[in-house]
């Protein structure tokens, strides 16, 4: 997992890494933006746990330390059978460790992908547990704000567990008007009022997300599917969706009350639990999930490797990249203005491998003036071969993000060197090389640059 000898608080036991004398670290379960998750054994109790390892340097560099602190504070506040339990928090000079309940059935999202959609009685089982967890959070003044199938895990018995409170808010975060004002969430699941910048009720916003999850469980697709995020939110604000014909009458009556664009008239939890669909007795429970032993041979952990796919970018990170609040130029190939720093920010349907090939080609055609110093699914970094002027070598970073199926956003920015040289490089070399893969460029005969 880590360079144990160099990391304070870690040691060795029987060939495996031991964290602060308490947890014997096992295999890597998954990777995140700021670290990874390991299965581990609590040496005091013998139980298996999940240990989330967070690299402080990455968190600080991304300006996310407050989010990590908030996630820890919230998880200490909520203890519920359908919420992943936080056992312990530890820290060293360079890392934060969260010992969590080990939930081994995988994401609910994975089950939806495999099955296409879920039987109505199974969906009711999951949905009841979701609502129970969400209602408990609200009773403790906690609003999740990023509810989606990827943040819902299943245990071996098929029971649901809510995770990832990194975007959650506490009731005391509300302003004088009693509303929350932070833009956050995931495209397709965030309530339309969250984007209006006039404040929103965290509980009602969570219920909208629950409604989207219920729709996805029953229909096997999103109610507002659209690659263009702007169009997606317009559909959500109009309530522009259709319930599949195979849904029961009670389900077809419930979903519009959850996906009500008006938060004032949207159904509350108290009303929801009294609806016929919610109260109906399920015919059967979801079957248990057969899994391998929780703690397999604790192989020496490897250093974190970069994912082989672009990082997922949610709508609000996308807004933070855009100048102003208008996302449409990203999806329309609008080239008139360019970005203030002379760089590029554009959407494309080109796969990550194609974008990378174009960027590497720029360096190859430059006669050795630029070289590739980093290349992967998350982006490419080009650096000048010559020392450069007083500000050093020119360095250009192109980060690649996924915002929807088959849609990427590429953010090109200066990573070092002289600004005038950077602008010239973007204008004369980068932009012509990337022009025909910018969304909307193929249909527009005018030169296409970035937002």
Swiss-Prot record:
Binding site for ATP: 29-37, 52
Region (PPI): 341-370
Database matches in InterPro entries: Kinase-like_dom_sf (IPR011009), NAF/FISL_domain (IPR018451), NAF_dom (IPR004041), Prot_kinase_dom (IPR000719), Protein_kinase_ATP_BS (IPR017441), Ser/Thr_kinase_AS (IPR008271)
Coiled coil: none
Pfam families to which the protein is assigned, alphabetical: NAF, Pkinase
Keywords, comma-separated and alphabetical: ATP-binding, Kinase, Manganese, Nucleotide-binding, Serine/threonine-protein kinase, Transferase
One GO BP: signal transduction
PROSITE patterns: NAF, PROTEIN_KINASE_ATP, PROTEIN_KINASE_DOM, PROTEIN_KINASE_ST
MF terms (GO), sorted A to Z: ATP binding; protein serine kinase activity; protein serine/threonine kinase activity
UniProt region (Activation loop), positions on chain: 164-193
Active site per database record: 146 (proton acceptor)
Domain NAF residues, every copy: 308-332
The Protein kinase domain, residue ranges: 23-278
Cofactor(s) it depends on: Mn(2+)
SMART domains the record matches: S_TKc
Record EC number: 2.7.11.1
Catalytic activity: L-seryl-[protein] + ATP = O-phospho-L-seryl-[protein] + ADP + H(+); L-threonyl-[protein] + ATP = O-phospho-L-threonyl-[protein] + ADP + H(+)
Domain notes: The activation loop within the kinase domain is the target of phosphorylation/activation by upstream protein kinases. The PPI motif mediates the interaction with the ABI (abscisic acid-insensitive) phosphatases.
Role description: CIPK serine-threonine protein kinases interact with CBL proteins. Binding of a CBL protein to the regulatory NAF domain of CIPK protein lead to the activation of the kinase in a calcium-dependent manner.
Family: Belongs to the protein kinase superfamily. CAMK Ser/Thr protein kinase family. SNF1 subfamily.
Descriptive protein name: CBL-interacting protein kinase 6
Organism, as annotated: Oryza sativa subsp. japonica (Rice)
Taxonomic path: Eukaryota, Viridiplantae, Streptophyta, Embryophyta, Tracheophyta
